[in-house]
Amino acid sequence: TPLRIHLVDNPPLFAWVEKEYFDFTGDKRRLNHLLNEKRYLQKHFKWFARAKAGERFECSPQRIYLNSIGDDGFTWTGRASGMDNTPRGRDAGGYHKALWVDAISQQALSAHCIATMEQALGNENEARKWNAEYEALKKKINHLYWDERDGFYYDVTIADKQPCRVKTIASYWPLLARIASREQARSMVNHLMNPGEFGGSYPTPSLARSDKDYHHQTGDYWRGGIWLPTTYMAIKAIEKYGYHEEADAIAEKVINQQLAAYRNMEPHTVWECYSPSGDAPSTEHGRRVRPEFCGWSALGPIALFIENVLGFKKVSAAGKEVRGRLKKKKGRHGIRNLRFGDIVTDIVFDGKGTVSVTSNASYSLIINGNTYSVRKGDTEIKL
């Protein structure tokens, strides 16, 4: 059957996904096919950059909502952005009257990832070109979307380029794209950890608790609901600036909420999104959200558990390395059959000071900032 796409103008995350996939596989043939032979990622970037609302494609029943406003960014909608009933655009007079900070930041992230992958292929000229694209977007975002008064990235009005002071989790996309300075990142982390905004016992609500449209009891979907895709994004975003303790703490709270909801609610399942005030699913228009939603909510018990609870943060098949943060307070823990490239390894920390590693090939294991050489066979590391 022909390809069918519900919303063509959903977030442009293909380049980020391919860069993460390359980290695991080291597959340069795939990169060459994507970037040199077909140029899929570049074409999608350029299409997104020039998109006009109302366009229609045979593969989708929907006209696109995304609208490019020159170099300043994009208008978007709740549905197309993925944040269906978000109150963003409230201060501007509607979705179509605001420039969306996540759209332009995701484009910057794409440019950065394309440049990184071109560099991996040895395409220096292309890497420079995409780095220049990234730097231009970075400059624009910091000039137009950063609000010095609140120390926060906001959507802005098209009419007078003033901040739309609706704090949402979407404002952490600039950090994932490494747009923020150290000082800007510190301010954003303060907002993220503030119990009156995005922190507390149930962190990363989609809308700040201080907002007048925040729905305390259930989150009412994107009016405070906790969504694993944006939670994962925010956690990875602050890690870019070294806030690992804060990232790990957020991850553990969210996973514990998922576990409690799984145990205590009927049916015992993984939910589409969660309440910002209790161990329960969120609601949409008064109805409980969808069950059996591993499509993205499994980011918690899989990705965040491995990366932020166990502490195995990053792999590089091309660089033959694993990066992690191991903590004695967690006791004995580790991972078995971790695969990246052609390497398969077990890494087990006894919780006291010894890491036992088994591998089918040599690689570098970077733990808590220190580099250790792992050989083929068994290796014992004293921390």
Q: Which residue ranges define each predicted feature?
A:
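Short, contiguous, pocket-lining structural segments
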Residues: 95-109, 126-129, 133, 166, ...
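Non-catalytic C-terminal accessory modules of carbohydrate-active enzymes
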Residues: 190-198, 209, 216, 220, ...
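Conserved helix-loop functional segments at active or binding sites
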Residues: 20-23, 120, 140-143, 147
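Aromatic-rich carbohydrate-recognition surfaces in CAZymes
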Residues: 1-79, 101-104, 225-241, 247, ...
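Extended glycan-interaction surfaces of carbohydrate-active proteins
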Residues: 1-5, 53-99, 139-226, 259-287, ...
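Extended, well-ordered alpha-helical scaffold segments
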Residues: 28-51, 110, 114, 121-142, ...
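Alpha-helix C-terminal capping/termination sites
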Residues: 24, 119-123, 177-179, 240
